């Protein structure tokens, strides 16, 4: 017993010495590989107006870890999930990341919103901590860190896919746009969408904007879009602002007008729970549909509903897939949790998740197909044809499920 205690103390001293010398690679890799648990850390808004996103990500990650642990873990190691509240603020996200590093985090699940994700990815660059980003979608939010990969679609893909979806499903030849000009997520989707519309021959007939400071009264923008006579309004915004827009727009547009958005609209029904018909005719691009007949999806939805009393959204599904992808990567890397080792195997993986079949490019972006959900009377269901995969896949040799 004394020999064991002495050995443990010596190991702790050696690990501390490596940290003191600034050898981040060893801290994130070899030392972590001898632990009995794989510590997954996540950052996101658990309080405030965007808490629905953060809580969904937290719950999806925790459910996956629980299932993996019950099945024997990863190479005999158990997974542990620790989520820290960022309140959606990039500076708070960096502080939360620091707390997770102090806790002994081996793998980071990144941030939830794009702004905080960029801050976390930057902070993690020197630590050799692998980042399996769940839902931060801004194109550049994982740039500059070759150990950062993501589960979710990136914004320019979503904008491009949305424009193609309009054309492929013959929804409209003329559209209106309503977006937040001072938000990277919203502005990024807008830019990609309009560029692709120009290529496909879809005309942007009316464009209206708002900022964070003007996100309470959209009457002027609503009236302009109504008067334009468009049959589709592209709204690449978050559910919080979308609920305000849709509430103020209710009854003003023709009944056959669609409001088309991307993953930021997830959770819209919860935001308009006082009258779910406010979300009627909302179309949302997504890789996940809770009503899918896929057995994997059905099992996930059932387990999530039993655990949390709610139907999982795309944010929960992305996080769930992220944890299973970490499992696949650790196994492919021979049990290592080193950021360098995990990043090295990512482009060789194929993961069959609840958000689809996923592969990854060297730039960290995923390849998988997108669908659209149409909301009617508080129920979302698959609509139209699926969009093509996000980018051309690289060659993949390993499969993990």
Please provide the spans of the model-predicted regions.
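Short, low-complexity disordered leader/linker segments with a strong preference
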Residues: 1-39, 70, 387-401
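Beta-alpha junction/loop-to-helix N-cap segments that form part of ligand/metal-binding clefts
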Residues: 25-30, 52-59, 71-142, 210-216, ...
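Extracytoplasmic "Venus flytrap"
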Residues: 34, 38-62, 84-91, 112-113, ...
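Extracellular glycoside hydrolase catalytic/binding regions
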Residues: 96, 127-164, 168, 289
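Periplasmic-binding protein-like
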Residues: 100-112, 131-134, 176-179, 229-239, ...
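An alpha-beta-alpha
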Residues: 148-209, 232
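Extracellular/periplasmic periplasmic-binding protein-like sensory domains
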Residues: 249-320, 380-381
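Segments of small-molecule ligand-sensing domains
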Residues: 306-316, 327-379
């Amino acid at each position: 017993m004394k020999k064991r205690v002495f050995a443990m103390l010596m190991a702790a001293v050696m690990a501390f010495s490596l940290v003191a010398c600034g050898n981040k690679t060893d801290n994130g890799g070899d030392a972590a590989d001898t632990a009995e648990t794989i510590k997954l850390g996540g950052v996101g808004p658990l309080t405030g107006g965007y808490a629905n996103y953060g809580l969904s990500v937290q719950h999806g990650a925790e459910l996956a870890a629980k299932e993996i642990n019950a099945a024997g873990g990863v190479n005999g190691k158990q997974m542990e999930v620790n989520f820290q509240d960022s309140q959606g603020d990039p500076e708070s996200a960096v502080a939360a990341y620091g707390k997770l590093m102090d806790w002994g985090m081996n793998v980071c699940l990144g941030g939830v919103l794009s702004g905080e994700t960029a801050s976390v990815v930057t902070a993690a660059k020197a630590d050799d901590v692998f980042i399996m980003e769940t839902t931060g979608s801004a194109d550049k939010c994982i740039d500059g860190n070759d150990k950062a990969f993501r589960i979710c679609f990136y914004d320019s893909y979503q904008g491009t896919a949305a424009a193609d979806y309009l054309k492929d499903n013959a929804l409209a030849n003329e559209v209106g746009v309503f977006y937040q000009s001072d938000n990277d997520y919203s502005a990024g989707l807008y830019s990609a969408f309009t560029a692709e519309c120009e290529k496909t021959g879809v005309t942007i007939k009316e464009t209206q904007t708002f900022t964070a400071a003007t996100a309470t009264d959209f009457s002027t923008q609503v009236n302009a879009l109504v008067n334009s006579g468009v049959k589709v309004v592209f709204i690449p915004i978050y559910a919080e602002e979308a609920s305000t827009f849709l509430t103020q727009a209710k009854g003003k547009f023709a009944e056959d007008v669609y409001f088309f958005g991307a993953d930021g609209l997830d959770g819209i029904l919860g935001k308009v729970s006082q009258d779910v018909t406010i979300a009627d005719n909302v179309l949302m691009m997504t890789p996940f549909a809770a009503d899918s007949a896929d057995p994997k999806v059905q099992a996930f939805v059932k387990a999530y509903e039993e655990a949390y009393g709610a139907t999982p959204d795309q944010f929960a599904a992305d996080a769930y897939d992220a944890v299973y992808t970490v499992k696949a990567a650790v196994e492919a890397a021979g049990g290592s949790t080193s950021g360098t080792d995990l990043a090295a195997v990512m482009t060789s993986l194929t993961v069959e998740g609840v958000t689809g079949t996923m592969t990854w490019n060297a730039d960290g972006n995923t390849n998988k197909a997108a669908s659209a959900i149409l909301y009617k009377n508080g129920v979302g269901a698959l609509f139209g044809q699926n969009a093509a995969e996000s980018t051309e896949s690289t060659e993949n040799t390993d499969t993990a499920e």
